Amino acid sequence: MTTEAAVLDYKVADISLAEWGRKEIEIAEKEMPGLMATRKKYEGKKPLAGARIAGSLHMTIQTAVLIETLVELGADVRWASCNIFSTQDHAAAAIAAAGVPVFAWKGETLDEYWWCTRQILEFEGGLGPNLIVDDGGDATLMIHLGYKIENDPSMLDKTPGNAEERALFAQLKEVFAEDNQRWHKVAAGMKGVSEETTTGVHRLYQMMEKGELLFPAINVNDSVTKSKFDNLYGCRESLADGIKRATDVMIAGKVAVVLGYGDVGKGCAHSMRSYGARVIVTEIDPICALQAAMEGFQVTTIEEALEEGNIYVTTTGNKDVITLEHMKKMKDEAIVCNIGHFDNEIQVDALNNFKGATRINIKPQVDKYVFEDGRCIYLLAEGRLVNLGCATGHPSFVMSNSFTNQTLAQIELWKNNYDVDVYRLPKHLDEEVARLHLGQIGVKLTTLSKEQADYIGVPVEGPYKPEHYRY
């Protein structure tokens, strides 16, 4: 499973799955025109030559195409998954067999997860990465927290708040014992991070506001060709895939409660409605609530929805959205799942520690909780990402959008010296990403005449919208 050396080559579930993984990667490549066009554009130019990239992002077949794109562009890459359940073991095996150090397998413990994250930050010769591809911000967090500990070692004496913190601090304690300036050296060599998801971007902005951000960051999530496609259309397909693979339930006729109506929530609400469910939306934001209502969804509180809901989906990026008290009041046989990045949207720890419920594992990532009155609920993927824990995540085509943005962001950070801040990719690159995907689905663009372009004040070749435009 591993090779013994100063720097580990890989750790995956089963390297013999590599051939299967390679066959699926070849299929995905045909569905990911943005990444393949980027490879062709930079063929022979190696714009990432010399870059050491640490990737913390779901180790799926689609991610394998991203990894091999970065390698073809000249980067030295090490990779781990950003979720304990999201790895596709045949994808990890194929990447390991191709010679890329990957540390990921489906069903990691928290200790294993943070060990894997540590491995991607340790390159040959004692070097750290100079670029990070992050999803949720855990690789970035490890560096920043380690840096803080080196400034204040007493942090290691504090009692961890939960199992996740305990596992993370255990790794950081080991690193500190080996080299009490390790993370200062890593941070000094960093050119930047590109962040994939809403939750990770939120972390970056928080660190920037507090003056704690150590290196530049590009917010890939808020590229239009990411948030309005991956978050919306990706979730519209992969949510139902996860629920159905986990439970085989008929969605038509059920009442689905979607908590949150941002881009992800919109995709989930439309997904459930397209299958014939009656959808109830909960929201804190009056604008999003009004949008949901104007789309014909009932908008109310979860407390009122508990009397009707059969399927619950959290999409908020917040914590304690579904509490233990909520779950105790749900209808018999209710299905509870999350599609936000972290597992704290649902109070899973409180449910597991509740003496009035018995947990019965049905199959991997499907647990039944039987309450004392005989009612039960089903929790999917232990409250983690249902589309990746119980299925295979978003389809390749929509991930090509997101990962082309990631690739362009990595080139941008490597080629330029940014000040420490959180940036977005410029509009012309957003439009380029979209343009690369049009031919695959038979789209033909209209071309402005010079007179038309002058009339509305834009270049003939774009960009066509101002930065403040909301798509």
UniProtKB/Swiss-Prot annotation:
It catalyses: S-adenosyl-L-homocysteine + H2O = L-homocysteine + adenosine. SUPFAM superfamilies: Formate/glycerate dehydrogenase catalytic domain-like, NAD(P)-binding Rossmann-fold domains. The keyword Ribonucleoprotein does not apply. It is an enzyme of class 3 (hydrolase). NAD(+) binds at residues 197-199, 231, 260-265, 283, 318, 339-341, 387. One of its GO terms (cellular component) is cytosol. Signal peptide: none annotated. Substrate binds at residues 60, 135, 196, 226, 230. Binds 1 NAD(+) per subunit. Its main location: cytoplasm. Its EC number is 3.13.2.1. May play a key role in the regulation of the intracellular concentration of adenosylhomocysteine. Belongs to the adenosylhomocysteinase family. This is Adenosylhomocysteinase. It comes from Chlorobaculum parvum (strain DSM 263 / NCIMB 8327) (Chlorobium vibrioforme subsp. thiosulfatophilum). The gene is ahcY.
